[in-house]
Curated annotation (Swiss-Prot):
Predominant place of localization: secreted
Gene3D superfamilies: Glycosidases
Domain of life according to the entry: Eukaryota
Functional description taken from the UniProt entry: Beta-glucuronidase that hydrolyzes beta-glucuronosyl and 4-O-methyl-beta-glucuronosyl residues of arabinogalactan-protein. Hydrolyzed heparan sulfate only very weakly. Has no activity on xylan from birchwood. Able to catalyze the transglycosylation of glucuronic acid (GlcA) residues from p-nitrophenyl-beta-glucuronic acid (PNP beta-GlcA) to various monosaccharide acceptors such as glucose, galactose and xylose.
Catalytic reactions on record: a beta-D-glucuronoside + H2O = D-glucuronate + an alcohol
Signal peptide annotation: 1-19
Residues at the active site: 194 (proton donor), 312 (nucleophile)
Glycosylation sites: 53, 91, 99, 143, 203, 222, 280, 427, 440, 465, 491, 520
Protein name: Beta-glucuronidase
């Protein structure tokens, strides 16, 4: 086939050092993602920081959520949970939202002794037009009087705070597969097993339903009431999700979504690197595929098992690692991870974050450990949302056209490139190309001290050559079909600042997280347009080539 177009120019076209050929099938997958595919999980103890309260709502967080909502038509769903939901006890006389004590021997990142007061639930008023998942305490609630009393006291408060369409679902317990082995302190004996977990889960969720019927009857109805579960930490721990399902976890048929958690590796795990661990498509694929194997085992037990989501996930467990989880390379990992997950059947992904967490998409407040600001991973979230968003001609209120299906376009020659196609109403609407080859511009690759100009080498690039469906040939009237390219860019994969999406910045210091077009970044309308050309020798297919620099991504949109 004759490739008509070599590519789309970027500000300065680098020397092409490699090229890959990819064929794009016109047949769309049949498994669309849910609305608000890019969603969040906020650490329970950090929720007041992220959301604020009635007197002081966190408008920075609200702006960042609004950005995503304006792109996709639905704001991200917020799951409030994590390890600290299973430490939280209720104190009705507490004059503020949360009192937490950090024990460095257990965790230096979040409190492990926690009391919440009535005003904790004010935080659910801060984000407008947002749906929530609230986490109740099973860790202490299932085996301690104080924990059980907390459940009795907080269900009425939570349900009243989440009325009026705010509630999506509940959770009861976070990562119960680790209850007997947790590094932060076990809350169950070594004999803890799936049958005991299911017994305690059913006991607690039935009490929750009883309390809802008494206090918030509208939230006890079948159309509203439900859970995401089992929220296990992974597939390799002591408790196994298929066995828990077989023990009757969904006996009451109230689990809306099958939720699992995932981290590619650990913050202090030996051998973890940006290139080898995060910017590595093979690692991402293997990590996600293990969950598909597990989910298929659940489906074999129960063919009607609910849809699959990541209820909590991010790059490296234990809140991430500086120089890895907070870099632009982690943003590129997030794009690859989210879209590969979508391509194999995950319906929604909740990216986890907390105050001072290294992998967080943003830091909600200033602390003695971190400054308030938009972090690199958020830009990856924006890119994923832009890829999945309804095409411009499709109204947000039309489910048939607004929900995307995603196809993984395998590249077998290297683990450092990946590509995906998005379809709406069976029509190819976008491609995204991710160059995961690292390109560092700071000393030690930690994103802090820039290398001197004399130490910088030319930034490599790869040309993605596409064979497209015949529908992307010239039209009958001879009008060329135009594409627009939007780029996710930074100075290098180790950068922690200076990141842009299509020339836009979402930084706190510019306009509180609202999008600001940077004048020194080339605009799409000026230099990132191209046309799909006519093929000649392979059945009339069209060709397209796109150059993508190392440590960057490009979205191709058919217009």
């Amino acid at each position: 086939m004759k490739r008509i177009l070599g590519l789309i120019a970027y500000a300065s076209v680098p020397t092409v050092i490699n090229a890959v050929q990819i064929s794009v099938d016109e047949t769309a997958p049949s498994n669309p993602v849910f609305d608000a595919y890019v969603s969040y999980s906020i650490e329970f103890s950090s929720f007041p920081d992220y959301a604020g309260n009635n007197s002081r709502p966190n408008t920075f967080s609200e702006n960042l959520l609004d950005n995503l909502g304006k792109i996709t038509g639905t704001k991200p769903y917020i799951r409030v949970g994590g390890n600290t939901q299973d430490y939280a006890l209720y104190n009705a006389s507490l004059p503020y939202s949360l009192n937490g004590t950090i024990d460095p021997k257990r965790s230096s990142d979040y409190p492990t002794t926690i009391f919440i007061g009535p005003s904790f639930f004010e935080s659910y008023n801060s984000f407008k037009n947002t749906r929530f998942i609230h986490g109740f305490n099973l860790g202490l609630g299932g085996n301690r009087t104080s924990g059980w009393q907390t459940l009795l006291d907080t269900v009425p408060l939570a349900c009243k705070a989440l009325g009026g369409g705010k509630l999506f679902a509940w959770t009861y317990g976070n990562e119960p597969d680790l209850f007997s082995t947790s590094a932060q302190g076990p809350v169950r004996p070594p004999s803890w097993n799936e049958a005991e977990y299911v017994d305690q889960w059913l006991n607690g969720t039935r009490k929750i339903h009883e309390l809802l019927e008494r206090n918030c009857p509208d939230l006890a109805k079948n159309g509203t009431y439900g859970y995401i579960a089992p929220s296990f930490a992974g597939v390799g721990n002591k408790l196994k999700a298929p066995k828990a399902w077989g023990e009757g976890l969904n006996e009451d048929k109230n689990i809306k979504l099958f939720a699992t958690h995932n981290y590619i590796s650990g913050a202090t795990s030996p051998g973890v690197t940006l290139q080898g661990t995060l910017m590595n498509h093979s690692m991402t694929k293997a990590s996600v595929d293990a969950h598909i194997v597990e989910y298929n085992q659940v489906k074999a037990i129960d063919a009607a098992a609910p849809p699959l989501i990541f209820g909590e996930t991010n790059s490296l467990y234990n809140q991430g690692r500086p120089g890895l989880s907070n870099t632009f390379g982690a943003a590129l990992w997030g794009v690859d991870f989210n879209l590969y997950s979508a391509s194999v059947g995950f319906k929604r992904v909740h990216m986890h974050m907390g105050t001072n967490y290294r992998y967080a998409s943003w830091q909600p407040i200033a602390t003695n450990k971190a400054t308030i600001g938009t972090k690199a991973p958020y830009y990856g979230n924006i890119a994923v949302a832009s890829f999945l968003a309804p095409p411009p001609s499709s109204p947000y209120d039309s489910p048939a056209t607004s929900l995307a299906t995603v196809k993984h376009l395998p590249i077998s020659s290297t683990p450092f490139l990946s590509a995906y196609a998005a379809y709406h109403s069976s029509n190819l609407t976008r491609l995204i190309l991710i160059n995961l080859q690292s390109y560092n511009t700071t000393a030690s690759g930690e994103g802090l001290a820039p290398l001197p100009p004399s130490s910088l080498t030319p930034r490599p690039s790869v040309t993605f050559n596409f064979t497209l469906p015949a529908a992307y040939l010239l039209t009958d009237g001879g009008k060329e079909k135009q594409v627009v390219v939007k780029r996710l860019m930074a100075n290098g994969s180790d950068a922690i600042t200076g990141i842009t999406w299509d020339g836009w910045s979402y930084n706190w210091e510019l306009d509180g997280g609202r999008p600001v077009r940077l004048p020194n970044v080339t605009r799409t309308s000026e230099s990132e347009r191209a046309w799909v050309g006519e093929g000649t020798s392979d059945g009339g297919k069209a060709g397209l080539g796109v150059v993508v620099e190392a440590g960057s991504a490009a979205l191709v949109e058919f217009v």
